[in-house]
Amino acid sequence: MARRYDSRTTIFSPEGRLYQVEYAMEAISHAGTCLGILAEDGILLAAECRSTNKLLDSAIPSEKIYRLNDNMVCSVAGITSDANVLTSELRLIAQRYQFSYGEVIPCEQLVSHLCDIKQAYTQYGGKRPFGVSLLYMGWDNKYGYQLYQSDPSGNYGGWKATCIGNNFGAAISMLKQELADKENVKLTLADAKDLAIKVLSMTLDTTKLTPEKVEMATLQRVDNKTVYSVLEKPDVEKLIEKYTKVQAEAEAAKKEKQAKQPTK
């Protein structure tokens, strides 16, 4: 029955569903994982790299994380060619605003502009939705640090921590639990890095997390300037080693506790 309604973007099914939008969301759920965490002193984006071939040119820009302007960065999950179109459009929107008004575009306004375009592709015939979701991290004078997520339907929202891509449900559950445990504690960027490694280690479909499989970037304010930096492979490796050591110590303590328990 669904085949009657899923060939065109603009036709609702009897249940009120737009199948092409749902198929776009399904494509994203098979893409590499991306997660974002909002901290007190900055924002973190972390992403799974699936193109780890040693023949790839390391000078080519990031596979998953893109700088949009001086104050905003985004991470993508989904069809890469669609992501390239949308990131180019985001940069153009930001440049036009800065040229017209002489200041950097507010974060939410940039996200909203792009989502209007994405929503239009769910409403006009002869087009299909963009098969990509985006995470945006940014800073502006009004709201400070901000983390947003948008999907193929054109919907967007602000988050403290979220995830898109493969195994996003398990990752969001972990983030929710970890942040609930630290509800009364201010989360620093260093804590966010450790948390990102923990979540990726436990949710990626890989036997062992390596620096080649992870991209991490941070955004901070230093001396009244927004500073965007991508973590180098040795820095990521140190974070992975730290997590591995903590896990080994926790496992050893658990076994020791079990050994001390009296047998019935």
From Swiss-Prot:
It holds the Pfam family Proteasome. Its main location: cytoplasm. Disulfide bonds: none annotated. SMART domains: Proteasome_A_N. GO terms for cellular component: cytoplasm; cytosol; nucleus; proteasome complex; proteasome core complex; proteasome core complex, alpha-subunit complex. It comes from the Eukaryota. It is found in: Cytoplasm; Nucleus. Signal peptide: none annotated. The keyword Isomerase does not apply. One of its GO terms (biological process) is proteasome-mediated ubiquitin-dependent protein catabolic process. Keywords: Cytoplasm, Nucleus, Proteasome. The 26S proteasome consists of a 20S proteasome core and two 19S regulatory subunits. The 20S proteasome core is composed of 28 subunits that are arranged in four stacked rings, resulting in a barrel-shaped structure. The two end rings are each formed by seven alpha subunits, and the two central rings are each formed by seven beta subunits. The catalytic chamber with the active sites is on the inside of the barrel. Interacts with PI31. The proteasome is a multicatalytic proteinase complex which is characterized by its ability to cleave peptides with Arg, Phe, Tyr, Leu, and Glu adjacent to the leaving group at neutral or slightly basic pH. The proteasome has an ATP-dependent proteolytic activity. Belongs to the peptidase T1A family. This is Proteasome subunit alpha type-4. It comes from Drosophila melanogaster (Fruit fly).
